[in-house]
Amino acid sequence: MSTITVDLATKKYDVKIDNTLHTRLGQEISAVWSARKISLLTDSNVGPLYLKDTAKQLREVGFDILELEVPAGESSKSLSVAGELIAKMAAAGFTRGDGVIALGGGVIGDLGGVVASLYMRGIAFIQIATSLTAQVDSSVGGKTAVNLGNTKNIAGSFYQPDLDLVDVTYLNTLTDRDLVEGYAEVVKTSALANQDFFDFTGQIKSVADIRHHAQELSKRAIAYKASVVMADEKEAGDRQFLNFGHTFGHAIELLAHGELRHGEAVAIGMIAISSRFEQHGIMPRGLTTELLSRLEAVGLPTHSHFIGTTDFFNHLINDKKNHDGILNLVALEKVGQPIIVKKKIADMPAFVEN
């Protein structure tokens, strides 16, 4: 087992990475939490696979479990669903001494974090990440948010967990598409981190390779993200680098109305922004091709007809990274050296179209 400690000014917690954690959840969680009520939150995809066994393990070590299941998908990542969950917890008599465990992927992690942060102004929170996206990215660092209308992640807060459990065995029940979606975030992280990690993703030539190397990929991605979060918890500086590909990606994801997964949209966003930065001499020639080869090797999409449309630019205007008409976009001077490039919203059509 690998343990990566996230040591922040206000909190310290471990991210544990292994392939047998699912067999000792009660042991791991009871080492961090005393006996209490737990709201065990999952979705309709993960629930049938893991909810009953997880609840059983937790009850065996003395926890009182409220099982909560929501429909799978982005539609559950809303204030209305969060409110319904909070109401159920209140009806069950939850107090400030109780906790929330998110058992699932990125949507459940976000939703669970929001619920934990809001209930009685904040109760304890643990992540059990079951998707590659959640394991390597969204479960680490404390970002929690829900969507409002057509704006992603607009309502939320930074709310760190007490523990983050990453068991790559959960990935065995993911479809190839679900797994590959998360791999887009791994490629992103490898480009931001260092040449050694980037070379490693260059060796991944198939979905089978992702599955075979999942634990090492997760460990490297989490180690990099943890280092960034420890240096900049609230995204005032270097944590913005983790948004590489996301400004364009979020717009594309919203315009696709569910036809594209988050990681697929991020893959498209990375190529779209990188190719334009190359054309403007901000990124080195050939780096876009290297990113492209890693993404296409596992079947990720890399182009979208939405880029450059009026609706695309409207979503950029509404992006939460828009500060007074200026977007902070992430580029790479070279692998391992990300930078922020400020672009006026008014200049984006010319930048994108050229």
Curated annotation (Swiss-Prot):
Signal peptide: none annotated. Its main location: cytoplasm. Its EC number is 4.2.3.4. The keyword tRNA-binding does not apply. Pfam families: DHQ_synthase, DHQS_C. The keyword Methyltransferase does not apply. InterPro entries: Dehydroquinate_synthase, DHQ_synth_AroB, DHQ_synth_fam, DHQS/DOIS_N, DHQS_C. NAD(+) binds at G106, V107, I108, G109, D110, T130, S131, K143, K152. One of its GO terms (biological process) is aromatic amino acid family biosynthetic process. It is found in: Cytoplasm. Keywords: Amino-acid biosynthesis, Aromatic amino acid biosynthesis, Cobalt, Cytoplasm, Lyase, Metal-binding, NAD, Nucleotide-binding, Zinc. GO terms for molecular function: 3-dehydroquinate synthase activity; metal ion binding; nucleotide binding. Binds 1 divalent metal cation per subunit. Can use either Co(2+) or Zn(2+). Its cofactor is Co(2+); Zn(2+); NAD(+). Zn(2+) binds at E185, H246, H262. GO terms for cellular component: cytoplasm. CDD domains: DHQS. It is an enzyme of class 4 (lyase). Belongs to the sugar phosphate cyclases superfamily. Dehydroquinate synthase family. PANTHER family: 3-DEHYDROQUINATE SYNTHASE, 3-DEHYDROQUINATE SYNTHASE, CHLOROPLASTIC. This is 3-dehydroquinate synthase. It comes from Leuconostoc mesenteroides subsp. mesenteroides (strain ATCC 8293 / DSM 20343 / BCRC 11652 / CCM 1803 / JCM 6124 / NCDO 523 / NBRC 100496 / NCIMB 8023 / NCTC 12954 / NRRL B-1118 / 37Y).
